A protein has these predicted regions:
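C-terminal motif of bacterial Sec signal peptides marking the signal peptidase cleavage site
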Residues: 14-18
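Bacterial signal peptide processing site
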Residues: 19-23
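N-terminal "domain-start" segment that seeds a small globular fold
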Residues: 25-61, 86
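Short active-site neighborhood of thiol/selenol oxidoreductases, capturing the structured segment around
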Residues: 60-84, 88
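Structural microenvironment flanking redox-active thiols in thiol-disulfide oxidoreductases
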Residues: 83-144
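Short, internal strand/loop/helix patches
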Residues: 121-187, 191
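A short, hydrophobic beta-strand/beta-hairpin element that forms part of a small beta-sheet core
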Residues: 192-205
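Non-catalytic, surface beta->alpha helical segment in thiol-disulfide oxidoreductase systems
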Residues: 204-224
């Protein structure tokens, strides 16, 4: 793991993590949320990328007024990324149909060289066909991460694969079941938190590793309030 500054919370979220490394659970926010409350509540950011259908996706315009979960990661992340997406999917299943219909889930790749639109779409469909996958040039993705208050992810060292099976890795305990659809054995650093924007277009809470689907589900009705 390499420590890099984050605009949102220099203390609570002061690093990027390489896949295969833990993000420690944090105490519940003082407001009653079940995640971590940023030191400063910021507005929903503005950036334009493209979705897996090749269409321009203006993040602020497309998600305005809706509870929105955002995760920056990559499809060949061995542990944190698939678990985060599975946790969000499980949380949505625990809430009411009305809240579930209002919510949006956006996954932004930090690995544009390997995460093509078909790869990203196939990977996300393991969790939900409704999840939005966003891609772009390295410069566009870097700008989106900075707009969200984090430093851009970068390629890092190798991740061990199973001997004789370069397309498989050993899953850590607690990792959600998932499949990969590209080459393994490498890592890309990324912010290992789920960003949760509310219907008022603010960021009142983020969820690090260790937060459960039930925790996220409990917060969803609050996030959905106008």
């Amino acid at each position: 793991m390499r420590a890099l500054p984050l605009v949102l919370t220099a203390v609570l979220l002061g690093s990027l993590t390489g896949c295969g490394q833990d993000a420690s659970p944090k105490p519940a926010a003082a407001t009653g949320y079940h995640g971590v409350e940023p030191l400063k509540t910021v507005n929903r950011p503005s950036y334009v990328l493209r979705d897996t259908a090749g269409k321009a996706f203006d993040f602020r315009a497309e998600t305005k007024g809706r509870p929105t979960f955002v995760y920056f990661g990559y499809t060949n992340c061995p542990d944190e990324c698939p678990t985060a997406m599975a946790d969000i999917a499980a949380a949505l299943r625990k809430t009411t149909p009305e809240v579930r219909a209002a919510a949006r889930v956006v996954f932004v790749t930090t690995d544009p060289k390997r995460d093509t639109a078909p790869v990203l779409r196939r990977w996300l469909d393991q969790f939900s066909t409704e999840f939005v996958g966003l891609l772009g040039t390295q410069a566009q993705l870097d700008a989106a991460q900075r707009a969200s208050g984090i430093e851009p992810g970068r390629a890092e060292g190798p991740v061990p694969t199973i001997p004789g099976r370069p397309d498989q890795h050993v899953h850590k305990e607690g990792t959600a079941p998932h499949k990969h659809f590209g080459p393994l054995g490498y890592s890309v650093s990324h912010s290992a938190v789920i960003f949760a924007y509310n219907a008022a277009d603010r960021l009142p809470v983020v969820y690090p590793g260790g937060v459960t689907p039930s925790d996220i589900a409990a917060d969803l009705p609050v996030l959905a309030r106008p």
